[in-house]
From Swiss-Prot:
This protein's UniProt keywords: Amidation, Biological rhythms, Cleavage on pair of basic residues, Secreted, Signal
Gene name as annotated: Pdf
Tissue expression profile of the protein: Predominantly expressed in adult head. Expressed at higher level in males than in females. In adult brain, it is specifically expressed in the ventral lateral neurons (LNvs) as well as in 2-4 tritocerebral cells and 4-6 abdominal cells.
Positions carrying Alanine amide: A100
Role played: Neuropeptide PDF is the main transmitter regulating circadian locomotor rhythms. Required to maintain behavioral rhythms under constant conditions by coordinating pacemaker interactions in the circadian system. Together with CCHa1, involved in regulating intensity and periodicity of daytime activity, possibly by modulating rhythmic expression of circadian protein PER/period in a subset of clock neurons, but not TIM/timeless. Acts on small and large ventral lateral neurons to control sleep and regulates the state transition from sleep to wake.
Name of the protein: Protein PDF
Signal peptide segment: 1-24
MF annotations from Gene Ontology: neuropeptide hormone activity; signaling receptor binding
Amino acid sequence: MARYTYLVALVLLAICCQWGYCGAMAMPDEERYVRKEYNRDLLDWFNNVGVGQFSPGQVATLCRYPLILENSLGPSVPIRKRNSELINSLLSLPKNMNDAGK
């Protein structure tokens, strides 16, 4: 019986250590700086690898906005949202709520 008590105590200690480790991880505010560095590295990689494939302006637009490919024959179109649309989508508000507030 004492073995099971020690085993349960060891498992609880491991769970507490895991929670402490998760608390020390990067907060969401810090993650955006990591993403900026990742985007810079990705842009540099595109510039170095695709020397003959992309022009410098084309590579910058590839990293800035997500692209929509409506069909394979047409050019890709960037998605752009206004700030109010972004805020409403984050708050899960319908579009008519925004019009009612004006």
